[in-house]
Amino acid sequence: MSLNLSRLSLLSSPRISISTHAPRKGYVCCSMKSYRLSELSSSQVDSLKSRPRIDFSSIFATVNPIIDAVRSNGDNAVKEYTERFDKVQLNKVVEDMSELSVPELDSNVKEAFDVAYDNIYAFHLAQKSTEKSVENMKGVRCKRVSRSIGSVGLYVPGGTAVLPSTALMLAIPAQIAGCKTVVLATPPSKDGSICKEVLYCAKRAGVTHILKAGGAQAIAAMAWGTDSCPKVEKIFGPGNQYVTAAKMILQNSEAMVSIDMPAGPSEVLVIADEHASPVYIAADLLSQAEHGPDSQVVLVVVGDSVDLNAIEEEIAKQCKSLPRGEFASKALSHSFTVFARDMIEAISFSNLYAPEHLIINVKDAEKWEGLIENAGSVFIGPWTPESVGDYASGTNHVLPTYGYARMYSGVSLDSFLKFMTVQSLTEEGLRNLGPYVATMAEIEGLDAHKRAVTLRLKDIEAKQLA
């Protein structure tokens, strides 16, 4: 679905028109519409920051019967849907990780995943908070303590691309948090096996079970539980519209399961000035566009000195040689460029758009970090492509999309924890605080609340008089 921008005024100057000239697969990288922020009304800017609407009504109609079937028939339903959708016949739906050996990988591949593991582990371990206890009044002590979520489900997509990096991003914080049961769901290969890179990452990061299924049936199996799949209490991970719909339905069902965040197509917003390399700008835009035809790609140009022709040529050149260039082409067809007078206007628009990924590729990029309010993850400076965060810098790549960065955070260690508050009062504490509580309870007309305090205060007073 493309973004409806028909009521916005296009720039009078030529659009960025991108063509691959001699495409290998019969596709053409489409043009990106262009707009000048200073010429748009506030309502037009609001339209520009809106994402394509997803009509979930038809998707729910498909997903609901799958969820019901898995609830009723468990593993058999998972097998049936896996054969129908993935053309794979499963003998076994769930693998116990303790029974699987660590797969052999090429040394360079193993080293890459090991470096990523170490960086992701270090960054998420540093998120552990120390327990703090506060004495608000004499004898009144309060604290907040954390506990791991007992069982979690991790969804690792396997549709248009295999994503072992997502296994690391989800399993490592679960491992650090101390989640006892960690179920990783991922579509099986045609022979019913698990992608060896995903298996390696899962073993390294402490996954306890692998559910060899994808789509809505995998989400339902983790939410309800089956004979072989443990029921989980929270489900994490990106997926297509059917996966997203299943998560939305199940979090509001009798399954009593929560989810990480709402999800939409992946997206990037790049802010660039005349100091940014056109080669890097093009590469960053295309690295997001290649995710899929529904990816959202936005370029914000600062000032009038950016060489748009050079960017056009680079996008055409790089798109032409990409194996997934057809996906990139379709994504670019509903993407756009906006022109900002300065960095203040550029960042103001970015904060309105609230991108999943925000790249700041301008001179002295670091000094603008303090103005950024809404973004899933930020990449600052010419040497920080989005790819490093996607794979191995240490930050998490499971992030809010679709503008949800205005109110949601990406996956972190806290996502796998729950927090309890604890309070304890001494006799002196209740003498100090109790009368105020009794007064407030009386104002609200809750006499039992009041008595729970006053009965104790009377006993304390009686002991003192004895």
UniProtKB/Swiss-Prot annotation:
Keywords assigned by UniProt, alphabetized: Amino-acid biosynthesis, Chloroplast, Histidine biosynthesis, Metal-binding, NAD, Oxidoreductase, Plastid, Transit peptide, Zinc
Cofactor: Zn(2+)
Reactions that this protein is recorded to catalyse: L-histidinol + 2 NAD(+) + H2O = L-histidine + 2 NADH + 3 H(+)
Transit peptide: 1-30
InterPro entries reported for this sequence: Ald_DH/histidinol_DH (IPR016161), Histidinol_DH_CS (IPR001692), Histidinol_DH_monofunct (IPR022695), Hstdl_DH (IPR012131)
EC nos: 1.1.1.23
Binding site for NAD(+): Y155, Q217, N240
Record pathway: Amino-acid biosynthesis; L-histidine biosynthesis; L-histidine from 5-phospho-alpha-D-ribose 1-diphosphate: step 9/9
Gene3D superfamilies tied to this protein: 1.20.5.1300, Nitrogenase molybdenum iron protein domain (3.40.50.1980)
Sequence positions that bind substrate: S266, Q288, H291, H357, D390, E444, H449
PANTHER family, sorted: HISTIDINE BIOSYNTHESIS TRIFUNCTIONAL PROTEIN, HISTIDINOL DEHYDROGENASE HDH
Purpose of the protein: Catalyzes the sequential NAD-dependent oxidations of L-histidinol to L-histidinaldehyde and then to L-histidine.
Family, as annotated: Belongs to the histidinol dehydrogenase family.
Name of the featured protein: Histidinol dehydrogenase, chloroplastic
Lineage: Eukaryota, Viridiplantae, Streptophyta, Embryophyta, Tracheophyta
Chain's gene name: HISN8
